[in-house]
C-alpha cells in the first residue's frame, strides 16, 4: 500500500538529529519559553525574511492572534470585514468569526485554486479592513494586483501560510509578503512538528509584541496582564524538532517539486485536470490536487490498487453546519473544486517506484 503520507518515514529522515534535539530539551529541565523557542523563532524569521517571529500553539491560534492584536491596537473592531478565499480550510474562517469579524468570501481561480484577484475589489465595502490570502496546497496566492489593492484601499494583508513553508514569490518567501502571516506546524505540513505548533511572522514590532502578550495570557511582564489573553505557546520540544527540520526544508521541497513535475509531464488522461507546469514550478506542493468529475470512482479505483488518497476538502466552509448563515451564497467554482478535488500522494519520502506506480494507475483510469 502506498500511503498518502507516512509520518514515521518523514521523521526517520532525520531521526537521530530529532532524537538528540528532544533529549537536549529533556536534559535541560526547561520545557516552555526557553532557549529552543527563542532560537527557532530567530531562525524561522531569518528563513522567512521578517524581523519578528512569535511562536504559538497552532496555526488557528496564529490567525486568531493576528486579528485579535489588530483589534487591541484599534485597527479593527467588531463587525469589520475580512476578504478571504471561499475554498479554504475552515480554520481560516474560524479565526475571523472568533474575533467577531465578518468573512467576505471570494471565489478562486479554477486553474490555480487561489483567490481570484479580479474579484476582490468588488467585494470591498466601507467596513473592509483586511484581505486574508491563503497559500492553498503550497501555491503562492499573492499577486501584484492584490498588493496594489491593499495599498490603494489602506487594507492590511494577512497571509495564511499553513501549507506553503518555503514557497517564494520572486525572491521573497511567503510569510513575508503581507503585514503579518500565520504558520501551522501540524505534523503533516511541509515543516511539521511532532505535535501541534504555530507561529506568526511580521515586520511590525508593535504587532509582534501585542501577539506575544496575547499568547501568554495577555502578559508582557510576569503577573502583569495588559489584555485578556490566552495560553498559546510553542513548547520547547516542538521548537527543537522544528529547528532540525527547518534545515532540510528547501531540499525536501525540491524533491516534492521534482515529483510534481513528473506527474504534470507524464500523467496523460483527459478525465483528469492537473495543475499546469507553471503551477508546479511555483508551488512547494503540500498537496497535489487533481480534479476529476468521477472523483469518488477515482479514489475507490486507486485504493483498490494500493494507493491512498485524500480530499481537500469535501465540504466548503459556507456549506458547513456551523456557518449555515452562509449557505445561500452562490459560489459555483468553490463548489466544483470541493466536488472534484482528489489529492494524490506527494511528499519527499516517496520512492521513484511508487511515483511510477501512481502515474501508471492514473493513466489507466
PLM-predicted stretches and their roles:
Residues 99, 152-153, 305:
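Helix C-cap/helix->beta junction micro-motif
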Residues 8, 37-42, 47-54, 60, ...:
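PLP-dependent aminotransferase class I/II
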Residues 111-193, 201, 343:
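Active-site phosphate-binding strand-loop segment of PLP-dependent enzymes
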Residues 30, 35-81, 95-99, 105:
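Phosphate-binding glycine-rich loop
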Residues 95-96, 149, 190, 237:
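Hydrophobic/aromatic ligand-binding patch that stacks against planar heteroaromatic rings
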Residues 1-30, 305, 345:
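N-terminal "arm"/small-domain region of PLP-dependent enzymes with the aminotransferase-like
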Residues 67-124, 130:
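Conserved PLP-anchoring active-site segment centered on the Schiff-base-forming lysine
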Amino acid at each position: 500500500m502506498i500511503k498518502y503520507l507516512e509520518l514515521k518515514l518523514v521523521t526517520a529522515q532525520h531521526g537521530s538529529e530529532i532524537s538528540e534535539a528532544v533529549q537536549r530539551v529533556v536534559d535541560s529541565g526547561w520545557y516552555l519559553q526557553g532557549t529552543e523557542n527563542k532560537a527557532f523563532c530567530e531562525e524561522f524569521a531569518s528563513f522567512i525574511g521578517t524581523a519578528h517571529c512569535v511562536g504559538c500553539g497552532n496555526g488557528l491560534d496564529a490567525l486568531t492572534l493576528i486579528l485579535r492584536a489588530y483589534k487591541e491596537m484599534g485597527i479593527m473592531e467588531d463587525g469589520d470585514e475580512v476578504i478571504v478565499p471561499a475554498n479554504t480550510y475552515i480554520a481560516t474562517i474560524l479565526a475571523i468569526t472568533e474575533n467577531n469579524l465578518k468573512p467576505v468570501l471570494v471565489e478562486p481561480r479554477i486553474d490555480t485554486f487561489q483567490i481570484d484577484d479580479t474579484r476582490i475589489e468588488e467585494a470591498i465595502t466601507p467596513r473592509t479592513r483586511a484581505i486574508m490570502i491563503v497559500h492553498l496546497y503550497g501555491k503562492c496566492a499573492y499577486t501584484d494586483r492584490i498588493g496594489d489593492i491593499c495599498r490603494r484601499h489602506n487594507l492590511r494583508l494577512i497571509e495564511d501560510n499553513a501549507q506553503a513553508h518555503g514557497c517564494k514569490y520572486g525572491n521573497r518567501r511567503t510569510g513575508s509578503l503581507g503585514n503579518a502571516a500565520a504558520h501551522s506546524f501540524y505534523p503533516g505540513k511541509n515543516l511539521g512538528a511532532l505535535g501541534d505548533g504555530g507561529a506568526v511572522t511580521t515586520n511590525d514590532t508593535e504587532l509582534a509584541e501585542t501577539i506575544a502578550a496575547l499568547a501568554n495570557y495577555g502578559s508582557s511582564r510576569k503577573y502583569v496582564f495588559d489584555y485578556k489573553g490566552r495560553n498559546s505557546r510553542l513548547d520547547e520540544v516542538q521548537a527543537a524538532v522544528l529547528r532540525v527540520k527547518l534545515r532540510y526544508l528547501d531540499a525536501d521541497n525540491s524533491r516534492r517539486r521534482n515529483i510534481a513535475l513528473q506527474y504534470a509531464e507524464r500523467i496523460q488522461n483527459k478525465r483528469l485536470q492537473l495543475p499546469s507546469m507553471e503551477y508546479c514550478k511555483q508551488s512547494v506542493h503540500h498537496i497535489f490536487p487533481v480534479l476529476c468529475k468521477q472523483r469518488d470512482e477515482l479514489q475507490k479505483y486507486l485504493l483498490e490498487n494500493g494507493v491512498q488518497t485524500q480530499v481537500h476538502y469535501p465540504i466548503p466552509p459556507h456549506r458547513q453546519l456551523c456557518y449555515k448563515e452562509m449557505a445561500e451564497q452562490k459560489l459555483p467554482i468553490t463548489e466544483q473544486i470541493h466536488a472534484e478535488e482528489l489529492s494524490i500522494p506527494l511528499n519527499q519520502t516517496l520512492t521513484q517506484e511508487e511515483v511510477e506506480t501512481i502515474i501508471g494507475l492514473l493513466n489507466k483510469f
